[in-house]
A protein has these predicted regions:
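Bacterial N-terminal signal peptides
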Residues: 16-23
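Short acidic-glycine loop/turn motifs at beta-strand connectors
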Residues: 46-48, 128-133, 161-163, 184-188, ...
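Zymogen propeptides
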Residues: 26-118
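Bacterial N-terminal signal peptides that target proteins for export
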Residues: 3-14
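Conserved, well-ordered active-site substructure
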Residues: 95-113, 168-216, 225-249
Length: 249
């Protein structure tokens, strides 16, 4: 499969009348979005111009775990944490459950096993950036790609794949949690979202497809979901995560 075939050049913007939108150079774009009376925080990144990184452990091999420790580490390096969100689902040992690539280095391999829980609700998938181009593909498709990502996180299930919702999502599901995920638009924008109220996976998937304009989107996690985004008034610095995905400058 040709990686470039996954990326379309058509430039589109998907902003709803219910969204409050603001942006300034180097800080990404922040929105508060409402869909079906549910509120979400949304943060957009342009990988052509913004530095999106993935973190798990510091150089000493200790897990960052919280936004505070990551922020303090970056500050000591002369860098700024602009935005952060927990990345893909992790194990009880606080290790990424699937593929985890930082700065081009493979730290955890692709997980193609069968199992129980959201991660293994097939199709699951991989979000990655390679040569400043973002993509989300299902795990099987990823094995066929000849690509060397700068960053990658595997999770599951896929919320949206090529414009189609996951076949095992149902509108009347009573599995309600605070949830976070990531999507990619046709113009190579990366879109992160977190719900402010408990929702089901069907509702979350329709947010990415119908309101945020993402033909592909990946579920990151639920119940433990958190966001650090001062531009949205969100300055939570706690957390107990494995992977953390961050906009750094």
């Amino acid at each position: 499969m040709n990686f470039s075939s996954l990326l379309l050049k058509t430039r589109k913007w998907f902003l709803t009348a219910s969204a409050l939108f603001w942006t300034w150079p180097g800080v990404g774009a922040a929105e508060t979005v409402q869909q079906h009376h549910n509120n979400y925080l949304v943060y957009r990144i342009d990988p052509q111009n913004d530095q999106l990184r993935l973190f798990w452990q510091n150089p000493q091999g200790n897990r960052f775990g919280s936004f505070r420790r990551l922020r303090d580490y970056l500050t000591a390096q002369g860098q700024q944490l602009v935005f952060a969100m927990n990345a893909g689902i992790f194990s009880t040992e606080y290790a990424p459950l699937g593929l985890h690539i930082e700065n081009g280095h493979l730290l955890r391999p692709l997980n193609t096993a069968k199992g129980w829980g959201n991660f293994f609700l097939k199709p699951n998938g991989v979000f990655f950036i390679a040569n400043k181009k973002a993509a989300i593909v299902d795990t099987t498709a990823y094995t066929k790609l000849k690509v060397k990502p700068d960053i990658a996180t595997q999770s599951g299930p896929l919320l949206v794949s090529k414009g189609n919702l996951h076949p095992k999502f149902f509108p009347d599901s009573l599995s309600l949690y605070i949830r976070n995920g990531v999507g990619v638009t046709q113009d190579n924008q990366v879109v992160f979202a977190i719900s402010l109220v408990p929702i089901n996976l069907y509702e979350f998937a329709t947010l990415f497809r119908d309101t945020l304009g993402c033909a592909d989107a990946l579920y990151l996690d639920g119940s433990i979901s958190q966001i650090y985004a001062p531009s949205l008034g969100q300055e939570f610095l706690g957390g107990d995560f494995a992977g953390i995905i961050a906009h750094v400058r």
